[in-house]
Amino acid sequence: MYTTGNHTINDSFGTAFMIGSFDVRYYGILYATGILVAIIAGILTLKYKYKVDDNPYFYYVFIGIISIIFGARTWSFIIGDSIVGVTPFFAIHQGGLAIQGGVIFTITTGLIFFFFILRKPKYYVKKNYLVYENHNLVTKTFYKQASMWIYADAIIPTILIGQAIGRWGNFFNHEVYGQGLTAEQALNQWGFLKVLMPGVFEHMFINENGVTLFRVPIFLIESFFNVIAFIIIVFLLDFVKELKTGGRTMLYFFTTGIIRLIIETQRDSQFKFVTSIVTSVLFLLGGSIGFIFTQWIFPRFRNKKNYFFLFNKVKIYFIGLFKNYLNKYKNLTKEEIRKKLEPSSTIYSKNFSEMFFYADDYDLMIKKD
């Protein structure tokens, strides 16, 4: 039981319905709904905005759902929100899902999954070009591996809308709230909420240690700004023609870092975790640095002999140095090793994202229409 400003409310407030003795809570429903909406948004973005094969994402969804739930639950124990030996690990319907852990685990598994699956030729993208061949203008179709940046830009920002929906589960569980205000202070500072969302306003009067105060609805603030960030990154940035691939991904980390840093520092003391604050700072810094690299540093490497040039020079040097210990190369001269390992010059005309994610597939598959 807990008490609001005017009356007492039973814990059943957070229960949507019962299945036998098992209570299905709004927290679990809203968290699942957030994941589903994010998945649908990612599929639509891949299919209609970027026009790349969405099948890899369909396959990843099964891994991603497990990753986000497992990661969020594990992170809850890491930051101290849940306690080992006290809190059941699989009682996720009762709360204790830390979204930062879900994001970290899901992106990590996504990097591994997409790195391998996008190397399959059936997922290559194709473009038709008019080229001169034997003094004739012919159409050729060029096939190449889709950059992981494309999938990242399409999928990762959709986490914001999932977070926005999932945060409402914290409202029904009476979690993620800020400092306490008296009824008079609440009306002065949050009177608009009583007009726009009277139910939310009423249920933010929470009794703690025998004292009933209005708790600042941090969940609502985060949900609101996540929706704004989602709209800006996914839709409004379409009008910024200078935005380069990878920018949306980094802006996700930047914006979610700012939002979470503000939210984490304003939480009630029982919901404030140092690890979450540090993680928010890392998201913010990582997004800022990553945005600079994707927009200004990486493009400067395009059409230049940099990444693979340096990599192969170092590789050739060390193989030549230790060739006597390598059966495959010990009978070759250093010049023969160089010719064998140095890639064709065509690799140097590829842009950075292609070089970075193409590994050893230097040559494009080409066929005539």
From Swiss-Prot:
Keyword Calcium: no
Keywords: Cell membrane, Membrane, Transferase, Transmembrane, Transmembrane helix
GO CC annotation: plasma membrane
Recorded metabolic or biological pathway in which this protein acts: Protein modification; lipoprotein biosynthesis (diacylglyceryl transfer)
Residue positions binding a 1,2-diacyl-sn-glycero-3-phospho-(1'-sn-glycerol): R167
Main location: membrane
Pfam family, one: LGT
Keyword RNA-binding belongs to the record: no
Subcellular localization: Cell membrane
Biological processes annotated in GO: lipoprotein biosynthetic process
Residue intervals passing through the bilayer: 26-46, 60-80, 97-117, 216-236, 273-293
EC number annotated for this UniProt entry: 2.5.1.145
Molecular functions per Gene Ontology: phosphatidylglycerol-prolipoprotein diacylglyceryl transferase activity
Enzyme class, UniProt record, top EC level: transferase
Family: Belongs to the Lgt family.
Protein's name in the database: Phosphatidylglycerol--prolipoprotein diacylglyceryl transferase
Organism this protein belongs to: Mycoplasmoides gallisepticum (strain R(low / passage 15 / clone 2))
Upper taxonomic lineage: Bacteria, Bacillati, Mycoplasmatota, Mycoplasmoidales, Mycoplasmoidaceae
